[in-house]
Amino acid sequence: MIAVIDVSGNNLTSLTNALIRLGGHFALTHDAQEIQKASHVILPGVGTARSGMTALQQNGLIDVLRTLTQPLLGICLGMQLLLEYSEEDDIPCLGLIPGVAELLKAERNHPVPHMGWNNLHWQKTSSLQQGLNNSDYVYFVHSYALKADDYALARCRYHEEFTAVVKKGNFYGMQFHPEKSADVGMVLLNNFLSLESKC
């Protein structure tokens, strides 16, 4: 069973529809035991870092997420919450992946938020990349990002490079929305769900 963490009342229709298309058995949940028993866990997120961390704290999930051994995927804000810190609201996050979510620099031809389609540049071979290449585009909506670093599986350029896909151990993050990224996003989600679970 796939646990989709639902703590903030976000509209998760696009994500749940994508999982249905992939034939995944999933539950929208904020129950700690259900999350711990899941084969895979997805942490979506829309809103601010503070609201996201507050919702996790109020539902008693911070320590739960920190001790998971199965694959955990953070999407958009969910990826940023996996990091050590966010400049948005100046708030500590889960600390599962080293790094800081920093405000993107706005330029004349690169307004913030970064909104729309952009392509991935894969840096490391990964099971997530299976069936994909550097010509594939995905859909972004974000103002904060992790600088490209050693944990980046894929990078993206929007005036400057940032991490688009990140991995440390069993913790994964996608700064874009795979559920809104057409066929490429479906491949990425399917690849994630195909990762071996140690739960």
Swiss-Prot record:
It is found in: Cytoplasm. The lineage of its organism: Bacteria, Pseudomonadati, Pseudomonadota, Gammaproteobacteria, Legionellales. Signal peptide: none annotated. IGPS catalyzes the conversion of PRFAR and glutamine to IGP, AICAR and glutamate. The HisH subunit provides the glutamine amidotransferase activity that produces the ammonia necessary to HisF for the synthesis of IGP and AICAR. The gene is hisH2. Keywords: Amino-acid biosynthesis, Cytoplasm, Glutamine amidotransferase, Histidine biosynthesis, Hydrolase, Lyase. It comes from the Bacteria. Pathway: Amino-acid biosynthesis; L-histidine biosynthesis; L-histidine from 5-phospho-alpha-D-ribose 1-diphosphate: step 5/9. Residues 1-199 form the Glutamine amidotransferase type-1 domain. The active site is at C76, H177, E179. The keyword Coiled coil does not apply. This is Imidazole glycerol phosphate synthase subunit HisH 2. It catalyses: 5-[(5-phospho-1-deoxy-D-ribulos-1-ylimino)methylamino]-1-(5-phospho-beta-D-ribosyl)imidazole-4-carboxamide + L-glutamine = D-erythro-1-(imidazol-4-yl)glycerol 3-phosphate + 5-amino-1-(5-phospho-beta-D-ribosyl)imidazole-4-carboxamide + L-glutamate + H(+); L-glutamine + H2O = L-glutamate + NH4(+). GO terms for biological process: L-histidine biosynthetic process. GO terms for molecular function: glutaminase activity; imidazoleglycerol-phosphate synthase activity; lyase activity. HAMAP family: HisH. Heterodimer of HisH and HisF. One of its GO terms (cellular component) is cytoplasm. The keyword 4Fe-4S does not apply. InterPro entries: Class_I_gatase-like (IPR029062), GATASE (IPR017926), Imidazole-glycPsynth_HisH (IPR010139). Its EC number is 4.3.2.10, 3.5.1.2.
